[in-house]
Amino acid sequence: MWKNGAMRGCNKETGEFLGPSRSQQRRTALEVLVLSEKLAALTPAQLAKLPIPERLLPHITETKRITSHIARKRQLAFLAKQMRREDDTTLETIREKLDASGIQAQREVATLHRTEQWRKRLLEEGDSALTELLNQYPQADCGKLRQLLRNTKTEQARNKPPQAFRELYQVLHGLIITQNSDNQH
């Protein structure tokens, strides 16, 4: 019997099939298995941000604990079975939140890459890259950036610890994050 109370079969009056086909059931089961694998890969802090029912959390924790390949595969299948018992809206909500957090992580990585690219360009190209940066980020402090660039080049020439190099990264990262948050609002 299905969740909606109907049995698989054919309606004698209309000839329509009741309930999902076996292929559809398999596809749904595989989707839930993939979701269970994603949940098992998350940290406890990431799991806490998701709307996961309390009765699933021990199963997820147990899956994370198991390291043996076959035992882990079996536990993932059990977790997926427990998840299939949940209603579709709960699973869909978990999927949406998980996708949203994945998109946010991609944005953060892109911001880190953009920051690193700007730092590299500023050190290699000098004033032309600084002018372009100031055009793109008018709120930037030109004097501080020039000073950090000079100090970074001096550090590199003398093989000193990269203190100004790191500070330059932090300043650029702050600029990019400020610009991104201004654009989103």
Curated annotation (Swiss-Prot):
Report the principal subcellular site: cytoplasm
Query: What does this chain do?
Result: Member of a network of 50S ribosomal subunit biogenesis factors which assembles along the 30S-50S interface, preventing incorrect 23S rRNA structures from forming. Promotes peptidyl transferase center (PTC) maturation.
For this entry, list what GO says about its biological process.
Answer: assembly of large subunit precursor of preribosome
> What is the protein's species of origin?
Xylella fastidiosa (strain 9a5c)
- Cross-referenced InterPro entries, in alphabetical order? DarP, DarP_sf
PANTHER family to which the protein is assigned, alphabetical: UPF0307 PROTEIN YJGA
**Region named Disordered:** 1-22
Q: SUPFAM superfamilies recorded for this chain? A: PSPTO4464-like
Q: Which GO terms describe its cellular component?
A: cytosol
Q: Which UniProt keywords apply?
A: Cytoplasm, Ribosome biogenesis, RNA-binding, rRNA-binding
Q: Which family does it belong to?
A: Belongs to the DarP family.
Molecular function via GO: ribosome binding; rRNA binding
Top-level taxon in the UniProt lineage: Bacteria
Q: Which gene encodes it?
A: darP
Quote the protein name from its UniProt record: Dual-action ribosomal maturation protein DarP
Q: Where is this protein localized, as stated in its record?
A: Cytoplasm
